[in-house]
Every structure is written in C-alpha cells, then in structure tokens.
C-alpha cells in the first residue's frame, strides 16, 4: 500500500504556531510524505510578503501567550515535551472592585481541583514557534524566512520545491490550509469599542503561579505569570479612547508625572495584596475586535481544489477569556486527524473516494464551527456585558454560588480544556 501514488496534494501556508502545530500533529497522526509546509509568500489573494513576514515576526517575538492545559497536552503529544514558560497553577476570577477587594476573595480555581500539573502555561510567541519548529524539523530544516530574501525569490524557491515533489495525476485533489494571517476583508466583526494596554508590570505579593481575571466597570483586567516572581504580564481593557489616553499619559514621561499618574490608576484597579512597583516602558495599546470568517472550508469539485482556514486565518478573538490560541490549536488537531483519515482512504484504494473526502471535510467543518462560534459568543458577551451595571451588580452573587464544588469543577474544566467535548483528542 505504501507504494500506491497519492491523489491528494497538501500545502500548509503559515509561519506561526497554527501552521507548525498542524505540521507536527500530522506527523504524529501518521501522515505519509510532505505536508507542504511553507513560508508566507506573495500570492494573488493578498497574503503577506516575506518582508512583511519578517516585520510581523519581530513584533510578535516577545508577545506572551497563554496556553491552556488542553493545549499543553496536545503540544506534548505531538512533540514529546512542553515549551519553556511559566506555569499557571491557580486562576482567580473577580467581579467588581467591592465584591472581591483582595487576593483570594474571588472564585479560585487550582490545578489540584482537576489533578493536573498546571492549568496552563504562559510562553512567548518566539519560544512556542521555536519549540514547534525544532520538533517539526528534526533534520535541521527551518521554516523561518531567511533574512534578506525578496518575495520573488521566495516564490521561486517554493515553485522549485513544488516541481520536485511527487507528481500527481490530473485527477489529484489540491488541499491548501491557511493557518496564519488575517480572517480577510469579508470577516464578520464584533466590536465592543475596547482597546487593551498590554505588557509587563512589576509587582510584589502575587502568589506563585497565580493568574487573575478581574471584571471591572470599565473593562476586564488580567494578570499572568511572567519570567520572574517580581513581574507579571498585564492585559488592561477599557473603551478605546480611555486606553489610548492611558498610554499617552505614560508617554508623557517622568518630568510630567505620566508614569506616576498611570501607576496610581492601575493600583486602584488591582486587588489588595498586589503591590504595583513599576511599569515597563514598552507597554502597548492594542485595538480589540473579534473578527471571524463565516466559512472556514471551500471546496471546488470542478478544479479539485480545497481551501481550509484555521487558527488566526479563521478567527481572532477578544482576549477576555484568553482562548484564541487554544481554539487555533484545536483547529489544527482536528484537521490533522481528518487529513490523515483522507490519506488512509487513498491508501486503501476505496471507491467513491472524492465523496468520502468531501464528507470528512464537511464533518470537520461542522465540528469546528460549533466549537468556534460557541467560544466566540461567550467571549463577545463577556467583553460587552461585563461593563454593564446589571453584570457588576448581579454577577458577584452568581460567582459565590459557583464556589460550590461541582459547579466550580465544571468552570475549572471549561477554563482548562475549552467549552467542548472531553479532552484530549488523542487518548
């Protein structure tokens, strides 16, 4: 069976965690042959050039990402190890500044509640990409775009590699997976008119492995573990005008008292027990919008071509629940299983192969649409409703009820594995 020529050609377009994870998950699931993993290049539908890719990589390199316990299981299953980072062993949810005014007064979820080693891990973008790239390319071949390569050179290299691959007959199907970039001009948007101040702050009093999600009247605030016990990663959301004003205040400099003014405001937003010592000057203001493709699968039987969008190419979420990356990794995991099943059907030489393949892809789309839209609706409503008076007044009472053991366990499991079927995907 191994010698039977394949009738499906695969290409993975992307340079980030989504593309690299899909490549590695395909290998883990038993994919035979080349996955077609390639760097971004200039193509007709407006995807980024090599020069733009290098600029994007530079800006992303130090960005902190929160991986859930489920995502860590997936990464370990397909690479054999975990990327270096800082474990989240405890997550505290607080609503309002009065109902929970100090550390420990909110809903506290611990890794021991689910007998896990951690509820999640905070890693940098570059660390995660390097980890997946190293594991995906055991022979030393890197997917990183070499510095100085012009877009047309990159296109020529890709064309040469295409010509060197196994020749497929005219009846071959071509499957392209778009795993990075923007959901596109036609993406559906949900705009809560919020921006976030993101970056490193210096604190004292934070328990080891502790993460905070605090829903305040002007927007959600999150603290995540960082490189040292004296620092944490801040995500401070508010309406766009207020966030931009806060950043301008910081940029005024010490002479105008800008940093001290922002420190005072942030101290008022943090719970008692967390002493804010300083702010990293590299804080940034990021506009927050949920953008998502309505369709993530396009099949053209006449051309025997399939396009699939996953991860950042399919959706970008508001960070209120910290689940965007985890959703993208679930996209990759389910697509890997689907594609390997399609290849197995080819190897077996089953009849009605095209119909079976289309059916499997449609089933993948159905599963992913259910998962992604459920999570997007949750994050959309949290971002929009959490600043409303009724939420600030009533939700603290609901949070007290959530401290009951069974309900708390459900919430903890949802945080760790997402609002979907049981994990991990791989037994």
PLM regions with names:
Residues 2-89:
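Glycine-rich FAD cofactor-binding loop and adjacent beta-loop-alpha segment at the N-terminus
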Residues 3-5, 70-200:
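Conserved N-terminal helical subregion
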Residues 10, 35, 174-176, 308:
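Hydrophobic "anchor" residues on beta-strands that sit immediately upstream
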Residues 42-58, 100-104, 137-170, 242-257, ...:
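Intrinsically disordered, low-complexity terminal tails and inter-domain linkers enriched
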Residues 172-285:
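Conserved FAD-binding catalytic core of PHBH/FMO-like flavoproteins
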Residues 242-347, 351-356:
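FAD/FMN-dependent oxidoreductases across multiple families
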Residues 337-427:
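C-terminal helical "tail/cap" subdomain of flavin- and related membrane-associated enzymes
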């Amino acid at each position: 069976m191994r010698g039977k020529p394949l009738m499906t050609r695969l290409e993975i377009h992307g340079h980030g965690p989504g593309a690299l994870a899909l490549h590695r998950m395909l290998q883990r699931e038993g994919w035979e042959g080349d996955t077609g993993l390639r760097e971004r290049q200039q193509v007709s539908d407006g995807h980024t050039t090599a020069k733009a890719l290098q600029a994007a990589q530079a800006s992303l390199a130090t960005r902190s990402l929160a991986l859930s316990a489920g995502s860590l299981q997936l990464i370990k299953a397909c690479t054999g190890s975990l990327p270096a980072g800082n474990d989240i062993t405890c997550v505290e949810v607080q609503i309002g500044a009065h109902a929970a005014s100090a550390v420990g007064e909110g809903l506290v979820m611990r890794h021991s509640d689910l007998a896990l080693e951690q509820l999640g891990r905070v890693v940098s973008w570059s660390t995660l990409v390097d980890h997946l790239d190293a594991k995906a390319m055991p022979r030393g071949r890197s997917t990183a775009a070499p510095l100085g390569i012009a877009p047309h050179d990159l296109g020529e290299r890709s064309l040469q590699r295409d010509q060197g691959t196994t020749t497929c007959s005219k009846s071959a199907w071509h499957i392209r997976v778009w795993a990075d970039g923007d959901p596109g001009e036609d993406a559906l948007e949900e705009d809560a008119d919020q921006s976030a101040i993101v970056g490193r702050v210096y604190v004292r009093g934070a328990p080891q492995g502790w993460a905070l999600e605090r829903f305040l009247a002007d927007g959600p605030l999150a603290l995540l573990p960082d490189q040292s016990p004296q620092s944490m990663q801040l995500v401070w959301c508010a309406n766009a005008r207020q966030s931009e004003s806060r950043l301008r205040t910081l940029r005024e400099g010490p002479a105008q008292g800008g940093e001290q003014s922002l420190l005072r405001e942030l101290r008022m937003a943090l719970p008692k027990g967390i002493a804010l010592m300083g702010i990293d000057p590299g804080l940034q203001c990021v506009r927050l919008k949920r953008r998502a493709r309505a369709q993530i699968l396009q099949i053209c039987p006449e051309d025997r071509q399939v396009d699939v969008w996953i991860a950042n190419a399919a959706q970008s979420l508001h960070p209120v629940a910290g689940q965007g990356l985890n959703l993208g990794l679930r996209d990759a995991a389910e697509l890997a299983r689907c594609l390997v099943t399609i290849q197995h059907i080819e190897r077996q030489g089953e009849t009605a192969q095209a119909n079976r393949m289309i059916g499997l892809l449609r089933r993948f789309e159905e599963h992913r649409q259910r998962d992604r839209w459920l999570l997007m609706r949750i994050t959309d409503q949290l971002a929009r409703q959490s600043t409303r008076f009724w939420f600030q007044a009533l939700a603290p009472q609901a949070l007290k009820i959530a401290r009951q053991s069974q309900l708390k366990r459900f919430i903890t499991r949802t945080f760790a594995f997402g609002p979907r079927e049981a994990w991990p995907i791989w037994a």
